Amino acid sequence: MATSELSCQVSEENQERREAFWAEWKDLTLSTRPEEGCSLHEEDTQRHETYHRQGQCQAVVQRSPWLVMRLGILGRGLQEYQLPYQRVLPLPIFTPTKVGASKEEREETPIQLRELLALETALGGQCVERQDVAEITKQLPPVVPVSKPGPLRRTLSRSMSQEAQRG
């Protein structure tokens, strides 16, 4: 199966705003595949000859960064599919305007970043309402050390206990 690929690169730079954008994606894939239901097989038992031929087709897959995918067979038209939106990196980077500012003066964390942080903590198994061990032990009743019992004192005399055992 032969395959050819075409990649695209786009880069943009804005010197005034000090911004840059760069993207690369695999745009077009053309592959030769055996065509289903298009094969020929002949066998001549007298001459001990066989002939086999498999039909081939060129499959086309075209992707775009706008979440559109086109699939089909070369020469027969392509079927277009709109892919579902998926959040991918890079996320917009948040930097506070005043690094040394107090908590009230700072800007709020962007919603996308808050959602990502919440997802990471949920997937990481971290508990939001986490308490230290010292705080948990403060809520417990105090631990009373177990005292060792002394030697057991007999309440019955030896002769009475032997009689009780005999029945």
UniProtKB/Swiss-Prot annotation:
Protein localization: Cytoplasm, Myofibril, Sarcomere
Segments forming a coiled coil: none
InterPro entries per UniProt: Telethonin, Titin-like_dom_sf
Bias type Polar residues, positions: 157-167
Biological process terms in GO annotation: adult heart development; cardiac muscle contraction; cardiac muscle hypertrophy in response to stress; cardiac muscle tissue morphogenesis; cardiac myofibril assembly; detection of muscle stretch; otic vesicle formation; sarcomere organization
Function (record text): Muscle assembly regulating factor. Mediates the antiparallel assembly of titin (TTN) molecules at the sarcomeric Z-disk.
Protein name, entry field: Telethonin
Provenance organism: Mus musculus
Gene that specifies this protein: Tcap
